[in-house]
Structures are given as structure tokens and as C-alpha cells.
Amino acid sequence: MSGQGKRLMVMAGGTGGHVFPGLAVAHHLMAQGWQVRWLGTADRMEADLVPKHGIEIDFIRISGLRGKGIKALIAAPLRIFNAWRQARAIMKAYKPDVVLGMGGYVSGPGGLAAWSLGIPVVLHEQNGIAGLTNKWLAKIATKVMQAFPGAFPNAEVVGNPVRTDVLALPLPQQRLAGREGPVRVLVVGGSQGARILNQTMPQVAAKLGDSVTIWHQSGKGSQQSVEQAYAEAGQPQHKVTEFIDDMAAAYAWADVVVCRSGALTVSEIAAAGLPALFVPFQHKDRQQYWNALPLEKAGAAKIIEQSQLSVDAVANTLAGWSRETLLTMAERARAASIPDATERVANEVSRAARA
């Protein structure tokens, strides 16, 4: 499907969970001849990341309202109006055929600006429960898509765009069948780490002894303290790294993952075909719980909520999974994934631009 001469504006910012799926769709459409620009904010990660991908970015001034004081709430309508006006001026100059909202505060004024100019608005919700911005924009959007069922009652489920190196991993049967020795446990806390996993897993390692080998991604600034915790637990042999640059290689190594359940993490684990023990971040919307639930229902994962988390709960769960069980769970995870999510989102963008 040629997009020669077509123009897309991607609206996404704040966190990798919004930005990385947007980049995947942008690259897919650029390969078809589309021109792509980005709408973001100058003080969040998209400001540095997006230009590195060869995409020009325009900035508006906007931030979240949740948890702000009364003065900020009183000033909010004016701030939103100013952000809408900035976005509208940018879009009048660029003249996109369609805009794609991937979430983050920037999507709100950006989506309203596009709608006010008669530009089709396509939305993608990455999480199992819809964010406030997307809930508002869904009322004016041309097309609404969701990664997991339940965020919107009638939206099409298309999955989350996932990195191609993860999609290229061999299937679980090829990767895991015939593996012997200690079960390989990958612990992932995200770029900031997960303090609860950093505190719990060294003691889990002590309980499980030589039945497991652990690769623990501790997050920024935590490597030394986590290594020390493993050593104090009598388990200095396990590998601790601050970051994992090549997640596809880590997934290929692992037999099972212990991690938070951010939207992209859940989608990547399903695409890789891996069993998981999810410990959702305690958010008032229980967003990460809803992200993980489809894989638990599919028999591919177990959720332990943070309030229920203990060394025994994790150790007993991992000890109870034989290699045969892990392979079955891995195959169920892969079956529950949507490997062509990027193409599905890109196709809807193309369709909206032609409408």
C-alpha cells in the first residue's frame, strides 16, 4: 500500500510506553513513502528520542493535571487552550492527512486541534484501561483501537506494536524444548528498576538454590546494592545489570520472566513466547493489573499483586513450574500475541487518510 505524498502527524509523549509504539508505526509508514512529523513536549523523552529516528518533532507546552494543586487546576483551561492553539498552528503549517494519537498529555490538545481543522484522528490505547486523554478523544476520533480487550467497549483489539527483533525470535518449541539444568529466570524492573523486585528476588534465589539461574535487571543506580543483596543471601553467582540493551537476546536466554506489567512489557513477553510472573505496579487505576490479566486468563502467566507479594509466594510459584509447564505456558503466550500489530495500526491510519 503506497503512501507516497501522504502526511502523518504522530502525537505521543512522556513515556516509552507511548513513544516506542508510535515510532514502530512511523517507520512502517515511512517505508511506504509517508512523510511523518511528531507532536511532543520539549521536556520529556520524545524530545531526544524521536529526532534520533530521523523524524522532525514540533513542541507544545502541556503537562498532566492529576495530583496538581488548586491553582494549577484553576489555570488548566487556559493552559489547555494555549496548547490547543499551538498545536493548531503547527498542523495548519504541516497539513497532515491524518493524526495518530498514541497517548500522553500531548495527545489531548493535539487531537482537539486536528478535529477542529477537519483532520481525521486515529487513536491507539496501549493499556488495558484507557487513559483520561484517550477517553476524551475517543468521542471525536475517526477510529479507536486498543491493545487489550476492555479499555473501550467496542474498539478493535489490535495489540501493541512490538520491536522487530523480538518478533524475529524462534518459536517457544524451537527455543525451549530440550533445555536442561537450572531454570533461567529473567527479572526485569524497567529502566527505573522495581525496588520491590530488587528487595525480594535475592531472598527468592536463596530459597530456590541451584534450581535457578537469575539475570536481574536492577535499574539505574541499583546494580551495586542488588549484587550485594544476592551476595548476602549466599547467591553471588547470579548476574545483575543496570540495563539490558538487547532485550531480544535476554528473552531468548530466559525460560521465565519476573517483572512489572507495563503495556509494552506484556506485549513483548507474549510476542517472544515466554511464561511470566507479573507483579503489577500499584496504580490507582490498576492499569498494570488489567494489562497482565489476558495472559493470566490464557494460562500463560500468573499475577501476584504487590500487596500479596512475599518471598514464599514467588519462590513457591517458580518452584511449581516444571519445564514441561513452562513450555506449555510459553506456547500459550505466543498464541495470545498479535505479531502484526504495527501493520494493523498502520493500515487504519492509511484508511482514515483516504476516507
Swiss-Prot record:
Q: Name one Pfam family in it.
A: Glyco_transf_28
**Primary location class:** membrane
Q: Which residues form a coiled coil?
A: none
Its job = Cell wall formation. Catalyzes the transfer of a GlcNAc subunit on undecaprenyl-pyrophosphoryl-MurNAc-pentapeptide (lipid intermediate I) to form undecaprenyl-pyrophosphoryl-MurNAc-(pentapeptide)GlcNAc (lipid intermediate II).
Q: Which InterPro entries match?
A: GlcNAc_MurG, Glyco_trans_28_C, GlycoTrans_28_N
According to its UniProt record, where is this protein located? Cell inner membrane
- Member of which family? Belongs to the glycosyltransferase 28 family. MurG subfamily.
Q: What is this protein called?
A: UDP-N-acetylglucosamine--N-acetylmuramyl-(pentapeptide) pyrophosphoryl-undecaprenol N-acetylglucosamine transferase
| Pathway listed | Cell wall biogenesis; peptidoglycan biosynthesis
Q: What is its EC number?
A: 2.4.1.227
What keyword terms does UniProt attach to this protein? Answer: Cell cycle, Cell division, Cell inner membrane, Cell membrane, Cell shape, Cell wall biogenesis/degradation, Glycosyltransferase, Membrane, Peptidoglycan synthesis, Transferase
Record-linked HAMAP family? MurG (MF_00033)
Gene Ontology cellular-component terms for this entry are: plasma membrane
Output the Gene Ontology terms for molecular function. UDP-N-acetyl-D-glucosamine:N-acetylmuramoyl-L-alanyl-D-glutamyl-meso-2,6-diaminopimelyl-D-alanyl-D-alanine-diphosphoundecaprenol 4-beta-N-acetylglucosaminlytransferase activity; undecaprenyldiphospho-muramoylpentapeptide beta-N-acetylglucosaminyltransferase activity
GO biological process terms on file: carbohydrate metabolic process; cell division; cell wall organization; lipid glycosylation; peptidoglycan biosynthetic process; regulation of cell shape
Class in the EC hierarchy, top level: transferase
Which superkingdom, per the lineage?
Bacteria
Topology versus the membrane, per the UniProt entry? Peripheral membrane protein
Q: Which residues bind UDP-N-acetyl-alpha-D-glucosamine?
A: 15-17, 127, 163, 191, 244, 263-268, 288
Catalytic activity, reaction form: di-trans,octa-cis-undecaprenyl diphospho-N-acetyl-alpha-D-muramoyl-L-alanyl-D-glutamyl-meso-2,6-diaminopimeloyl-D-alanyl-D-alanine + UDP-N-acetyl-alpha-D-glucosamine = di-trans,octa-cis-undecaprenyl diphospho-[N-acetyl-alpha-D-glucosaminyl-(1->4)]-N-acetyl-alpha-D-muramoyl-L-alanyl-D-glutamyl-meso-2,6-diaminopimeloyl-D-alanyl-D-alanine + UDP + H(+)
Q: Which NCBIfam families does the record match to this protein?
A: murG
Give the matching CDD domains: GT28_MurG
